[in-house]
């Protein structure tokens, strides 16, 4: 029998089924770099506006992990999506270069080398070199992800110009009257020997002693209450702070009960405390707390007086209703102390050990000198003697240093703060506090997800003043001079701008290198002897929080507009970068420095647990890229609900690889089947069939859905719409029905050419929607298809833009086939019956069948195409009958070329195939 395979249109494409991504992607990216792809993104001339995404800087220390990849890939998808919509893109990646982790790395390195480095300039030089090294490492690792941005000129917070900009932002805060030096309790990391801001504190479970202690009322108090014995009972989980107790706080207007044994507690808590065995059951007297105010008790640890005061923070839900108050070790205690003029006792050094103040103020025995507070607690508890009513251990949420993961303490020190509740002048001449301005600004920002708005609002509503100063070396100094004559900072503009100019020219190392005279402008140098330097450095959150000024404002729009269109970071940045940026923006410009905030979750393992080396559940980013390629990693990011935590395991990546293969193989099929098109046919109108109109209308519908989802940054929804279309309407219906025409019709056949135009339209939209995510792959698609490039008038992926399917195909409207849903229902019923006949061995495939449809209104051609039968009508040999149709054995012979049962003679081509063969 004659072989007809070579007469079919079995077109091939050089676009491979196997992507070999880990090998090919680096070559593609190198080409983009050579062609300056990002410059093209910056210079788009479609006049659809500009788009600025401001990069929250990663820390220049260590290698990238999967969390970094998640963040940078999401940003890349967002900016490419805006670019393909026709906008000019501004995106400058940056790095946070100062701070404690780098200091710790250098200190560990020096310890290994058994050397010390007292010279701060040389120490800072080592820190700078360390940051440079990892900045380059991370930059190269980012590029492997296929992300684009201004990586040729990234921002670095340690650059001289940048340090000067950070300092000028600080000066702006000072000029508004919001920067003040205060002696008050702040979070202190004894492990880092430095103050911490709220954003640098994380809460973890910690075991602590829980003790109930009796403070005996002094004689005058007993006489006032007309009782012989009364002891206020306090509860604390920080026995080490008892040395600094100066007061006991009660709830205002609350009832306090005195027991038979003389213990005084809140009546609302008496029953609970009696059940614990802290106090006895019998109540002999009741007092209003207001009548107890200003009584004096005795601290059993050191016999010092403890004043009874009233505080709004006192709870009647737990504890005793009598709160141990040490203004040197608690913020609420401190503010209560201001009201009652309480003494601030604080005798703990920067390492967390008791200092000589315990001796000078007779707070503790000298044997405690130099002992760490947590080690001393056991002795302190023992020293309480009979005043200790109950001791037990509890596990509770406790603040820890986010860098060292060690517990932190409250410690009163002199620090610099940005004041949240100090009114300052607004643009309209009114006065508002920073808290008020920030809360107003939040209302004008869009949040994705929307829950982020209330989260940030709550944090701003409840946050304390921002502690800016750090007792370290690697950072931007709080470069102010204190006038020794007045003990006030010099905020003269001439002095501050002179220092800023020095930083810009020589870097802020000069603050350590130069003497005071050389740091002052000439007109102030004669008074140098009256000044001393502030030697604290800035909280690194101020560095990163002021990046919008250094990157967007100082470059006057060359690197984007301020406020930026979008910022996109992990959800932890509500208490970090989003908050610091918001506060600085509100001080300097009375507005948020961003229009939209998008947040993502964290990377966790398949059980939902945080990844850590100790658990052995870390998934290596480098290994993922080598095994799957960056486009699969990018698709994994996009196909997950990134607004929640992302679970990761090899199983998830294998699933993603299947999604990727579906998209890739679909594109390969499309490319192959329009590869033989004559380019002259691209611009002329075509005669589209009802089936063509069906798929084109479906394409238009899903395009609107995908666009809408992507506009809302719902990548999962958009991709699921796209995947459902590819799987169901496209592959499951249209492509199956069109294969006969594509493979067997003449290349000049109008029906086939119309189908090819449809395939081009589908490929175009797939490329447009997938390009922000699978950029390497879509570049490869275009590289391997001259026809698609001509259709889109695009030489590569960066020329892509959205198309109007109607306009591109010269159509005014889509004409959906009549009764199409009925034909699809018929197809479903037919396939069920066909499966039964196949299992029974009656037929091998649908082409062996003829069908008589009982609903005569259905289009016969459409039925034949969609059901892929050889004949619609009655034939001799009945195979089966259902209420909707009757199946017959096809009445003609099998065509040896197209395999349809259309031939009038055995082993002879059907009429259609004969005509095609004549043309060849």
Curated annotation (Swiss-Prot):
Per UniProt, L-isoleucyl-5'-AMP binds at: 569
Residues recorded as binding ATP, renumbered to this chain, are 613
Example GO biological process = isoleucyl-tRNA aminoacylation
Keywords (alphabetical) are: Aminoacyl-tRNA synthetase, ATP-binding, Cytoplasm, Ligase, Metal-binding, Nucleotide-binding, Protein biosynthesis, Zinc
What is this enzyme's catalytic activity, as reactions? Answer: tRNA(Ile) + L-isoleucine + ATP = L-isoleucyl-tRNA(Ile) + AMP + diphosphate
Example of a GO MF term: isoleucine-tRNA ligase activity
Just give the chief location class. Answer: cytoplasm
Cofactor descriptive note: Binds 1 zinc ion per subunit.
* Motif 'HIGH' region in this chain: 58-68
- EC number(s)? 6.1.1.5
Q: Which domain of life is it from?
A: Bacteria
User: According to its UniProt record, where is this protein located?
Assistant: Cytoplasm
Q: Where along this sequence does the record place binding of Zn(2+)? A: 895, 898, 910, 913
Q: Which cofactor does it need?
A: Zn(2+)
Known NCBIfam families for this protein?
ileS
- Job description of the protein: Catalyzes the attachment of isoleucine to tRNA(Ile). As IleRS can inadvertently accommodate and process structurally similar amino acids such as valine, to avoid such errors it has two additional distinct tRNA(Ile)-dependent editing activities. One activity is designated as 'pretransfer' editing and involves the hydrolysis of activated Val-AMP. The other activity is designated 'posttransfer' editing and involves deacylation of mischarged Val-tRNA(Ile).
The entry assigns this protein to a family as follows: Belongs to the class-I aminoacyl-tRNA synthetase family. IleS type 1 subfamily.
Quaternary state and interactors: Monomer.
What's the name of the protein? Answer: Isoleucine--tRNA ligase
**Species this chain originates from:** Helicobacter pylori (strain J99 / ATCC 700824)
């Amino acid at each position: 029998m004659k072989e007809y395979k070579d007469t079919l249109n079995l077109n091939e494409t050089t676009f491979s089924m196997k992507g070999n991504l880990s090998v090919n992607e680096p070559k593609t990216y190198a080409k983009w770099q050579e062609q300056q792809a990002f410059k093209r993104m910056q210079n788009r001339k479609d006049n659809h506006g500009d788009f600025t995404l401001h990069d929250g800087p990663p820390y220049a220390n260590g290698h990238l992990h999967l969390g970094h990849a998640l963040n940078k890939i999401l940003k890349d998808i967002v900016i490419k999506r805006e670019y393909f919509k026709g906008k000019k893109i501004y995106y400058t990646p940056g790095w946070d270069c100062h701070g404690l982790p780098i200091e710790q790395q250098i200190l560990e390195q020096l310890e290994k080398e058994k050397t010390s480095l007292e010279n701060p300039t040389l120490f800072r030089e080592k820190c700078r070199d360390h940051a440079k090294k990892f900045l380059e490492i991370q930059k190269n690792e980012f590029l492997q992800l296929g992300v684009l941005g201004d990586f040729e000129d990234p921002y670095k917070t340690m650059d001289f110009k940048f340090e000067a900009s950070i300092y000028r932002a600080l000066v702006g805060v000072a000029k508004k009257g919001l920067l003040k030096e205060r002696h008050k309790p702040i979070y202190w990391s004894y492990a880092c020997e430095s103050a911490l801001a709220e954003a640098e504190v994380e809460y973890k479970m910690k075991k602590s002693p829980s003790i109930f202690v009796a403070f005996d009322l002094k004689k005058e108090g007993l006489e006032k209450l007309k009782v012989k014995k009364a002891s206020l009972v306090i509860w604390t989980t920080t026995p080490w702070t008892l040395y600094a107790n100066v007061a006991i706080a009660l709830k205002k207007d609350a009832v306090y009960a005195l027991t038979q044994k003389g213990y005084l507690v809140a009546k609302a808590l008496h029953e609970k405390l009696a059940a614990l065995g802290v106090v006895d059951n019998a109540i002999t007297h009741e007092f209003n707390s207001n009548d107890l105010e200003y009584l004096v008790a005795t601290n059993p640890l050191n016999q010092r007086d403890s004043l009874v005061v009233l505080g709004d923070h006192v709870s009647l839900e737990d504890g005793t209703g009598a709160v141990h108050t040490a203004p040197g070790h608690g913020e609420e205690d401190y503010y209560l102390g201001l009201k009652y003029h309480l003494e601030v006792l604080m005798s703990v050094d920067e390492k967390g050990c008791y200092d000589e103040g315990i001796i000078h103020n007779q707070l503790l025995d000298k044997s405690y000198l130099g002992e760490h507070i947590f080690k001393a607690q056991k002795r302190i508890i023992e020293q309480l003697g009979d005043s200790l009513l109950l001791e037990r251990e509890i596990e509770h949420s406790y603040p820890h240093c986010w860098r060292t993961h060690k517990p932190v303490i409250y410690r009163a020190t002199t620090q610099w703060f940005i004041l949240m509740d100090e009114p300052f002048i607004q643009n309209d001449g009114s006065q508002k506090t920073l808290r008020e301005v920030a809360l107003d600004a939040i209302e004008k920002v869009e949040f994705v997800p929307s829950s982020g708005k209330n989260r940030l609002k709550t944090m701003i509503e409840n946050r304390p003043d921002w502690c800016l100063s750090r007792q370290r070396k690697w950072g931007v100094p709080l470069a102010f001079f204190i006038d020794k004559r007045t003990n006030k900072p010099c905020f003269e503009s001439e002095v501050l701008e002179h220092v800023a100019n020095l930083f810009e020219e020589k870097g802020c190392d000069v603050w350590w290198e130069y003497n005071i005279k050389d740091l002052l402008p000439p007109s102030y140098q004669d008074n140098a002897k009256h000044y001393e330097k502030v030697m604290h450095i800035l909280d690194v959150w101020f560095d990163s929080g002021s990046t919008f000024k250094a990157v967007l404002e100082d470059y006057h729009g060359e690197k984007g507009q301020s406020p930026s269109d979008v910022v996109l970071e992990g959800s932890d940045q509500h208490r970090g970068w989003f908050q610091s940026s918001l506060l600085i923006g509100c001080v300097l410009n009375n507005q948020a420095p961003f229009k939209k905030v998008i947040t993502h979750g964290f990377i966790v393992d398949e059980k939902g647990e945080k990844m850590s080396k100790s658990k052995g559940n870390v998934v290596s980013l480098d290994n993922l890229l080598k095994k799957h390629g960056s486009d699969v990693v990018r698709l994994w990011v996009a196909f997950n609900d990134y607004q929640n935590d992302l679970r990761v395991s090899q199983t998830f990546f294998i699933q993603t690889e299947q999604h990727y293969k579906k998209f890739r193989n679909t594109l390969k099929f499309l490319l192959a089947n329009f590869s033989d098109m004559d380019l002259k046919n691209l611009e002329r109108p075509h005669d589209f069939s009802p089936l063509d109109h069906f798929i084109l209308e479906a394409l238009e519908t899903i395009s609107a859905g995908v666009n809408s989802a992507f506009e809302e940054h719902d990548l999962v929804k958009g991709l699921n719409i796209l995947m459902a279309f590819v799987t169901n309407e496209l592959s499951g219906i249209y492509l199956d029905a069109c294969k006969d025409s594509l493979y067997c019709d003449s290349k000049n056949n109008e029906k086939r050419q119309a189908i090819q135009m449809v395939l081009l339209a589908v490929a175009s939209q797939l490329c447009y929607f997938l390009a922000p995510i699978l950029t390497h792959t879509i570049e490869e698609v275009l590289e391997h298809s001259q026809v698609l490039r001509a259709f889109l008038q695009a030489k590569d992926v960066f020329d892509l833009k959205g198309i109007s399917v109607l306009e591109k195909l010269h159509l005014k409207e889509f004409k959906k086939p009549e009764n199409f849903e009925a034909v699809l229902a018929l197809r479903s019923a037919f396939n069920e019956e066909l499966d039964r006949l196949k299992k029974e061995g009656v037929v091998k495939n649908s082409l062996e069948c003829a069908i008589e449809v009982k609903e005569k209104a259905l289009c016969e051609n459409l039925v034949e195409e969609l059901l892929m039968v050889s004949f619609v009508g009655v034939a001799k040999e009945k195979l089966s009958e259902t209420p909707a149709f009757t199946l017959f054995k096809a009445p003609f012979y099998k065509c040896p070329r197209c395999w349809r049962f259309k031939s009038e003679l055995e082993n002879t081509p059907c009429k259609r195939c004969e005509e095609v063969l004549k043309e060849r």
